[in-house]
């Protein structure tokens, strides 16, 4: 698992960037975007960072299915068949006096998270907590500034103990580790992080990958992290392996189980890689699922 994480952080993130550059720009949404909404009495904001555009070459999606099978899924959904677009976003939770950020995007070299945060009326020094779903570069890259200093200097940075150990031992995030170590607090899967937020273990993607369930009264939202990546492919064919997953069979089983639960419950979710702002529900369709967005960009 730790080996998979090391490979994932370096080569997978590099493939993201290379593929995105190869496909130039997609003008779907502004570079800087902040979409506010509520869960019960809580104020939340979906923050845009960047997006990746990957070729449909079966090197990331459909590893065990092939290009033609992926093409069919994309065509059936009315999407372009030569490329797969993934958003990269973060979630801000305003919980009383606490400003809690879930994940941090790719960082200053390619992301606009800080600009989107400021557009929402919040400066980095106001963030009190940063919750990390897992240690891939498009989720922890924004923990440091271009000069290597902590981006959220007044925040506690929280993640599972297993994920922190994997990041430290991986060798691909040494600058981040050096900068944030004094800020890091770890927890066990399933821990209550704040009165409104609980971690939810979703195994397979990385050693300590976690989702976060946000609750206010009778309303809930699950920030799913990288439990699913494509709003089309990961839902239509959740059994297909994805290159990003460290333990692919376990990640597949976790994905199928989670999507089934979400379709039955109708629970609202935030997915950082689904089309921005990534807020919606999962519905059953045939042998798979479909994405039902609840908010427009």
Regions found by a protein language model. Name each.
Residues 20-24:
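Sec/Tat signal peptide C-region and signal peptidase I cleavage site
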Residues 25-26, 38, 122, 126, ...:
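Metallo-beta-lactamase
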Residues 102-104, 128-138, 158-160, 202-204, ...:
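Active-site neighborhood of phospho(di)ester-bond hydrolases with catalytic His/Asp-centered motifs
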Residues 55, 99, 105-182:
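Active-site HxH/HxHxD metal-binding segment of metal-dependent hydrolases
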Residues 32, 55, 109, 135-142, ...:
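Active-site environment of divalent metal-dependent phosphoester hydrolases
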Residues 8-19:
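Bacterial N-terminal signal peptides
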Residues 30-119, 211-228:
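Conserved beta-strand hairpin/beta-sheet module of binuclear metal-dependent hydrolase folds
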Residues 26, 217-297:
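Cap/insert and terminal regions of metallo-dependent hydrolase folds
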